[in-house]
Regions:
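Short linear motifs at protein or domain termini
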Residues: 1-98, 152
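Conserved amphipathic alpha-helical segments that form helical-bundle/coiled-coil interaction surfaces
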Residues: 102-170
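Short, intrinsically disordered, charge-balanced linker/junction segments flanking boundaries
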Residues: 172-174
Length: 174
C-alpha cells in the first residue's frame, strides 16, 4: 500500500509540474484542491503533499490560510534563473571534462545529435513535437554535466532547468 501511495504521489507530482511548466496551469492561478482532485485523480492529502513539494521547488506558492497558487513569472525571475543555470552548468561542465571518460563523451555526442536533428525539424516549422524536443534538450544538458560527480549539483540543476523551461514554454522558443 505504501508503494502505491508513493506511485500516486510521484505521478501526481509529475503531472502537476508538467502542467505548470507547459502552461496548462496559468501563472498566478489558484489551485483549489476540490477542483483539481478529480483532474489529477488524487486525494486531498496527496495534493497537499505534492503542492508543498512544488512550493519547496518554487513552482507553487503556498500562502497560509489562503491556499496554493501557481508561482507568477517575471523578467527578474527569468534573469536570475538563467544566471544561476549558467553558473551551475559551467561549474558542472568543468568537473565533467575533468572526470568524464569515453562513455561520457559518447553519450554527449549522441545526445547532441538527437537534439540537433529535432531542432532542424523545428526550425523548418514543425513544432508538433515540443515534448520530444524538451526531452532531447534535457538529455543533452544532462549529458554535458553528468560526469561532474555531484548528486546535489545535478539535483539543483534539474530544478533550475525546469524553471527555465517553464519560461521557454510560455513563449515557446528553443
Amino acid at each position: 500500500m505504501g508503494k502505491h501511495q508513493n506511485t500516486v504521489g510521484s505521478s501526481t507530482y509529475e503531472k502537476i509540474k508538467h502542467d505548470i511548466i507547459f502552461g496548462q496551469l496559468v501563472p498566478g492561478s489558484k489551485l483549489k484542491l476540490e477542483l483539481i482532485k478529480s483532474q489529477y485523480e488524487a486525494s486531498v492529502s496527496t495534493l497537499r503533499e505534492t503542492l508543498n513539494r512544488l512550493a519547496s521547488e518554487g513552482f507553487v506558492l503556498a500562502e497560509e490560510q489562503r491556499g496554493f497558487y501557481v508561482t507568477e513569472v517575471s523578467q527578474r525571475d527569468l534573469i536570475e534563473i538563467a544566471k544561476l543555470r549558467v553558473l551551475l552548468e559551467c561549474h558542472a561542465l568543468k568537473a565533467s571534462v575533468g572526470s568524464g571518460d569515453d562513455d561520457w563523451e559518447g553519450n554527449l555526442v549522441a545526445a547532441h545529435h538527437k537534439l540537433q536533428l529535432m531542432e532542424k525539424k523545428m526550425i523548418a516549422g514543425d513544432i508538433s513535437e515540443k515534448e520530444t524536443w524538451k526531452r532531447y534538450d534535457w538529455e543533452f544538458h544532462l549529458a554535458v554535466i553528468k560526469a561532474c560527480n555531484s548528486k546535489n549539483l545535478l539535483d539543483l540543476h534539474s530544478i533550475l532547468y525546469d524553471k527555465y523551461l517553464r519560461y521557454q514554454m510560455l513563449v515557446f522558443t528553443f
